[in-house]
Amino acid sequence: MKKKKSLIFAVSIALAFGLTACSESESTDVESASCEKADLATIAEGKLTIATGEPAYYPWVIDDKPESGEGFEGAVAYAVANQLGFSNDEVVWVRTTFDGAVTPGEKNFDFNLQQFSITEERKAAVDFSSPYYTAPQAIVSYKSSKIAGKTSIAELKDAKLGAAVGTTSLDAIENQIGAKPQVFNDNAAGVTALKNGQIDGLVVDLPTAFYLSGVEVTDGLIVGQLPSTGAGDQFGLLLAKDSKITTCVSGAVDAITADGTLAAITDKWLATDAGAPVLKP
């Protein structure tokens, strides 16, 4: 399996067992009667229809085959489906554009996952589940860089690191690494500086790091990701506005967070296998 990096790269838990609001009389018009599989108002009876992009990229989906369950979002999708009571064979995959998914209106899916950041603006048009991912910060460099192969934050104290102004990435250089950053107007300017050897590494969120290291930077690599602080964009499963299963889907995400399933998936697909190890102190 060729790992071709390409475009686009937790919180307090409310256990699924406690999500009883969906059975209250005043909410039965917008939510399923319960979160039992037989009671879920899915697009197709007895099936769970999940959408992703066309194409879907590594490391979110491997080889553009979400049905394999390989890749971070492929694995998350099946974990949520199983938590809701659906077997893998009862999952149906469809494809949508990113913009089409976030536009108000009827949907041909029960939920969609394409690294949708949860924002107030989008929440006016669609529903989101509880977050299944909070994007950490990562350091992009290139193979001949002096920081290539470094495995700890301590080894980066004297490195020339840059980030875009006003970003969480800039804060991470100062607060997590303890270095004085070079500040750029945007990531594009930072990439140019990296290519010209003016900086050793550019700090961006991990999804952006996958893209930059695979597409924009020759011989690019991800030195590593910084330990998560809980800050950063949060991704949620996207559902139609006022979907009858939003509460149940959120409950499933909360449950796989609570039992460690989500952490294991994250470690496998967005750290160990993705070539983006978490840097040691």
For every predicted segment, state its role.
Residues 100, 116-125, 200-231:
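A ligand-binding cleft/hinge motif common to bilobed small-molecule-binding domains
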